[in-house]
Amino acid sequence: MILYLTYNDQPSGVYWSQVTDVVAHLNTLGGPRVRLLALVSARDYFTIRRKIRAHCPDAVVLPMVPQMKRWRVNAAIVALACRWFRPTGIIARGVLATWMALRARDKALVGKVCLDARGAYAGEWEEYRIVDDDALIAQFRAVEREAVLQTDMRLAVSQALVRHWQERYGYTGQQHVVVPCTLGRAHEEHVGPGGAMRSELGFAESDVVLVYSGSVAGWQSFGLLGGLLRGALAEQPKLKVLFLSPPDSGIDGLAAEFPGRVLRRFLQAEEVPQALQACDAALLVREDTLTNRVASPTKFAEYLANGLPVVISAHIGDFSQLVQVQRLGHVWNEGDALPVLGRPVPEERQRCRSFSLANFTKQAHTEAYRTLVAALT
């Protein structure tokens, strides 16, 4: 058995597509059983456990030790789980979970550990202060260094992230695979034309609808986004903007400046595909930070899967070059105006969707997943 360990991750669309769907795919490969072990907040434990088990019925969901500053104590819970399940390996999502898994390996409770790295963790904490605690932030470089250099296998979301490991931590090995953030099941299934949703949202056939899906906080860079959209809305009278986001004062301010042209909706994960298909282009603009230079935003594949060309910043992981080479939208450089946007023809929508399904499904990366599982067996 292999355990897939997550620590302090909240159930969300990202968790379903990047954790529970991955566990389900790994269990189709004919190798050892892979079982999710999720350490979650004790504050809302039963609700979180119910949500996770709805997507992954055999998941082991346990309450973690309260308070982030005591995160290391959770290694004892992981050790107990290893004594019970006797796994051959652990895939650990993030460097904190990896540290816990390495402590179990130190005690010979598990044979091998894989770091499932979703980004540059120390850089992200230093740049965006995920937790406002200097002592905790200061721990991260050493923890990430050990996770990168001492694990038996590594899963990176981008080649840019591997280069970061090489430059910052001196990683020289080849014991890694690169799998970008892949599509969740809801986006793999074609839900049909978005005409009904387009009408429901109040968009006319002559409107050009630019969509942004997700949070606008922190590394999502609303300050940069807001300035760019103000200029575009002023210069392109047919342009309208749809935010599929939680409430935000920045979005409210933009909507007040451009009445009837900026809308916000916050939808359930299963409702998002149809809303995306009602739009004409997608926006993936972020500031130039280490966090974003190694990133693999889940929204990129989702936008393409729903037939949307993407306007993307010039420094987003491996994706900016991909957009340019494969003609999947427009690469935007900070300081430039947003390009004049139009409605894509059906052939362009289908090309975007086909590219996403060919490159961003779990099945498209089966060989990488097989390599990972074999390294832990």
Label the model's feature ranges.
Residues 5-22, 43-45, 92, 217-220, ...:
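A short, glycine/small-residue-rich beta-strand->loop->alpha-helix junction that serves as a flexible
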Residues 6-13, 25-72, 161-162, 168, ...:
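N-terminal strand-loop element at the rim of the active site
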Residues 7, 111-145, 172, 179-186:
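Acceptor-binding helix/loop patch of EC 2.4 sugar-transfer enzymes
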Residues 13, 17, 220, 266-277, ...:
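Nucleotide-sugar-dependent
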Residues 24, 76-84, 99, 103, ...:
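Membrane-proximal helix-turn-helix segments that form the acceptor-binding/catalytic region
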Residues 42, 137-175, 183-185, 249-253, ...:
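A short, active-site helix/loop in glycosyltransferases that binds the activated sugar's phosphate group
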Residues 245, 249-281:
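Nucleotide-activated donor-binding/catalytic signature segment of Leloir-type glycosyltransferases, i.e.
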